């Protein structure tokens, strides 16, 4: 019997520019179609770290030429990234399904996610976005543009922005209805458009980028998914990563995860939120499983052949 699965796809897996994205979504679609073909109901969430930074930089460059142009809020940049990533991914996935003789629909839902305007994350930016830079380039941007910057898991330096905790998925009912009607749904792009609920049902955009793994966990929990698959750049979670005593983990319990987190084993903004999201989902209801693995290993991971499985 097929499972209801939420996939959290990393923004870096979608390429650094539009041509790369066009190629990346084709490979991504093959892996997603494998799961659909196996009889699973699939909802796809994705990151947007590189993409939202590119959009923000493009508008900043335009304002240099047109100083009177409006400043585009970060929440609107997230919305734009949902649109253009969803467009490419939706078309590539539909094409792949049709090539396999599968008739499921594919729908992208512009998704808002509620955050707390008083979340301390707004005072302590941690979420990397945009292009990787050298330390010198990053320090220059910090001086000239007032950016908050940080090293990103040894891969270079990036701008960091606020990443508040996701509280509710506004379009949850729509996403559920589409999934139950045998559609592959693309939702919570970039962690969702961050909004703050004000009086009289008004939603106000927030200057933030929500972590897509935590947003995907929230979505999976409230869709009553059987499995959350968090895709990353490695086949399994490791402790002592990139050290001589590195150890790959086939399984991980919440208790073990908390011990490793306390030891600082997982990089903030990289593997840490993935493990935290996996633990939260596994603990949310008996029988739920989270899987952390490579995109191309997702189907094998479901079958228990690879990846790191997080269960209670």
Where are these regions (language model features)?
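C-terminal catalytic "cap/lid" subdomain
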Residues: 2-312
């Amino acid at each position: 019997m097929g499972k209801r699965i939420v996939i959290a796809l990393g923004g870096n897996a979608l390429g650094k520019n539009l041509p790369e994205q066009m190629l990346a979504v084709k490979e991504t679609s093959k892996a997603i179609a494998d799961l659909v073909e196996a009889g699973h109901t699939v909802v796809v969430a994705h990151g947007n770290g590189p993409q939202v930074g590119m959009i923000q930089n493009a508008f900043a460059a335009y304002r240099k030429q047109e100083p009177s142009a409006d400043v585009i809020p970060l929440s609107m940049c997230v919305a734009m990234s949902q649109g253009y990533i969803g467009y490419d991914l939706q078309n590539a996935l539909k094409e792949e399904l049709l090539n396999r003789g599968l008739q499921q629909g594919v729908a992208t839902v512009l998704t808002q996610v509620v955050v707390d305007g008083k979340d301390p994350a707004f005072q302590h930016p941690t979420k990397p976005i945009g292009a990787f830079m050298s330390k010198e380039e990053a320090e220059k941007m910090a001086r000239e543009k007032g950016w908050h910057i940080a090293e990103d898991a040894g891969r270079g330096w990036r701008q960091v922005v606020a990443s508040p905790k996701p509280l509710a998925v506004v379009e949850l009912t729509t996403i559920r209805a589409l999934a139950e009607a045998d559609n592959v749904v693309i939702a919570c792009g970039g962690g969702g458009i961050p909004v703050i609920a004000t009086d009289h049902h008004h939603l106000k955009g927030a200057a933030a980028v929500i972590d897509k793994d935590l947003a995907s966990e929230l979505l999976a929990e409230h869709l009553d998914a059987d499995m959350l698959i968090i895709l990353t750049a490695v086949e399994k979670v490791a402790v002592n990563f990139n050290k001589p005593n590195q150890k790959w983990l086939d399984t991980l319990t919440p208790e073990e995860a908390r011990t490793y987190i306390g030891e600082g084993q997982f990089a903030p903004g990289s593997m840490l939120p993935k493990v935290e999201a996996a633990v939260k989902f596994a603990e949310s209801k008996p029988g739920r499983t989270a899987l952390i693995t490579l995109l191309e290993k997702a189907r094998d991971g479901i079958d228990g052949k690879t990846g790191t499985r997080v269960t209670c």
